[in-house]
């Protein structure tokens, strides 16, 4: 270590040649050092001498490659402090590709490019009306044939101040054809767009280092996904330390959504987006409604459109502003005025999706600023000592669960074990086949005989179900490969989500029959449906607001209403007839008798004499008998028995009163029975001569009086 302190990283005679006219390439430091390898606790070291170069390699701003050539001609020997010329000078060539920023994408859902409101002028607008009435605004159905209630039309009355001004017609049109109205509906014809959430960004580029010594050529390629490499002859080793920050920050789009046009594909699979980057747009997240419940936002659905307040008095196309086509038209107008677009990618960014292995659903932009990469190159030489520990390792297992492409990201869990006897550092590279975004190499330290797990996030660039092959490469502290393992994982196809919109593409319903037999079938179906509806009355219940809406019921010929209205009109005469029949059967005779017994006073006066009349009759009868007995008996006998006769007379009067009451009671019963018989004879139409005679006498007395 003393030699390491004495040697102050001195290298001389460095000649640097520049190609492609790229400025700013710098050699940051140069040195010689002796690296000693320790493989066990025995203390034995395996040492070798290296020449170390620390370079700052820029990226080309034009998208081409920037190169440097460094030829080492002289080195300083520590033992003699003299400059010595290298007999065969090595030539180092470094090429760095253009840098790009690669962004993680997460599929959110699909949205329509231009939602449209349709209206139909009609006179029979109803929510469940067919295409013959509301035409394009007929309710839609899903793949299973179920009616989608949220797609039903909204009916608005006619008038000049309505959502769609229309004439109401004259009074004759209203009476014959019905009142005019308009049907409004939301539909999604035309293009659809994928919506992606934008996640973290990663910087991408590649550095190619070539070392030529005489006729021998060593070459390595490194980048953020593979930051260390060793040539096959172990003469050259390269380590990518990192990048120097620029003055301009790389844009972050975490508050934006990327919208990409959805192209047609076979068998319902999402199509490739191709290179139609002119339609790609970046829009703020606040402009979207992912649940479709907000008006005037991208992704608006049926519920938001149908439930907007004051629908019929709101302007036409309300709730459908700020859609994708509005932003696209705004960009086109700016481009026509020779201005930069505000939402589109073309014109704002360079080298869109030109990174290696670009998939149909990946997103990258070119970095226009020159970025410097810190690169360390090691060559064989003799210099200072540097001791490091090296230990073998092994990849035990790799596990990658199946996941949905684009919507989710995969996680590769790699289990590694230090199989040596010393603690050492390792690096792990995870390289996948085409179609998976690259992942950066990881560095870590493992204790002897210990096991650790390293995780990598995998982002496929395709939305179809596919299988991928990945290779995990374990490197030791000398960047030499110590183990390699392959694995496979699968992804399921991205499930496209249209939100609250109809899942199947919108098509205008067919209203015309396709042939003669189809016409017969449609006619027969209409007849059957009309007959069923005529009997059940579903149309009347849905279209007529009240029971007494006569014009509506007459217009739609409602059978149930006609039956109910006829029953209502026939209720009064039927009730009267029923009461008359019950009267004829004598059901109400007890009621009549009860009324006569309690409330018919004139009848009682005619049949029952008063108490005074009865007493007077008794006294008159007594006087008559007493006068008759006065002439037959002597005065003495009458005088002797006068007191006894009075007592007997009083007793006889009471008995006579009782017998008279019984008589009149029997007379009342006979009169009542006669009235009942008279009613029965009248019911059956029987008239007796005696009844006729009595009736004639009653009429004669009335005329005389």
Curated annotation (Swiss-Prot):
Annotated region described as Disordered, given as residue ranges: 617-646, 668-705
Chief location: endoplasmic reticulum
Residue ranges, Cytoplasmic side: 583-705
Bias-annotated ranges (Basic and acidic residues): 690-705
Cellular localisation: Endoplasmic reticulum membrane; Cell membrane
Tissue-wise expression: Expressed only in mature pollen, in the two sperm cells.
Transmembrane segments: 562-582
Deletion phenotype: Defective in pollen tube guidance. Prevents gamete interaction and fertilization, resulting in male sterility.
Gene Ontology cellular-component terms listed: endoplasmic reticulum; endoplasmic reticulum membrane; plasma membrane
Keywords: Cell membrane, Disulfide bond, Endoplasmic reticulum, Fertilization, Glycoprotein, Lipid-binding, Membrane, Signal, Transmembrane, Transmembrane helix
Ranges facing Extracellular side: 25-561
Domains (record comment): The N-terminal domain (62-541)and the C-terminal domain (583-705) are both required for functional gamete fusion. A positive charge, and not a conserved primary amino acid sequence, is required for a functional C-terminal domain. The N-terminal domain may be involved in interactions with another membrane-bound protein on female gametes, while positively charged C-terminus may function through electrostatic interactions with the sperm plasma membrane.
Name this polypeptide is given: Protein HAPLESS 2
Upper classification of the organism: Eukaryota, Viridiplantae, Streptophyta, Embryophyta, Tracheophyta
